[in-house]
């Protein structure tokens, strides 16, 4: 409880429904919600990546270009600031990605994996401590698409439902309040030994591009084709 209340002193709002509307909120994932009661209030969870972003403790890496991402758990020493952000056309609305595992202060979480937060910052809601009432302004995208406190283990990706993608077209999907299509798909989500990997916008081309060089030994019956070697390639298919 002290950690929760002191976090208010540092500026964080409550994430539970403060008007008791019954709205489904982040629950045990956050110290500012039911997480303050984890392990009979003895082991509150780590501050989320969004909460640490608010404190100025981390600056999440923005995902813009196609890439392959590897994420260590935030509970690992030295990786407390391993987080990513996907922005929308509204500077106050974005998505925060973090890897949560049942270790350290996160030992009593109900689930583990890639947790995706949908943030829509509205100053008046923050000032009135009404962030998560009728609409969720600090929300977890439930991978299994179930808003149920009995299925929290399915909230993270891939989770119990083995959900490996989050795109404009999946359910649940990237669904910003702006109504736009983000064209920022997260695919191939995997969790192996607590490490999360995924591809953003299809992933990076790890092999590189083939660069053709001028042909040599040009004769009536043929020529020698030339190109720069491609890293890790074991063969090439040439169409003439």
Predicted regions and their residues:
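Extracellular hydrolytic enzyme modules, especially secreted metalloproteases
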Residues: 1-109, 119-122
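A detector of low-complexity, intrinsically disordered, Ser/Thr/Gly/Pro/Ala-rich segments
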Residues: 23, 39-41, 46, 149, ...
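A broad, structure-centric signal for solvent-exposed, well-ordered loop/edge residues
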Residues: 39, 104, 123, 219-225, ...
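Hydrophobic beta-strand residues in large extracellular and virion-surface proteins
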Residues: 69-71, 86, 116, 140, ...
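Extracellular low-complexity, Gly/Ser/Thr-rich intrinsically disordered linkers
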Residues: 76-204
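Pro/Thr/Ser/Gly-rich low-complexity, intrinsically disordered linker/stalk tracts
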Residues: 204-232
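Extracellular low-complexity, O-glycosylation-prone stalks/linkers
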Residues: 232-240
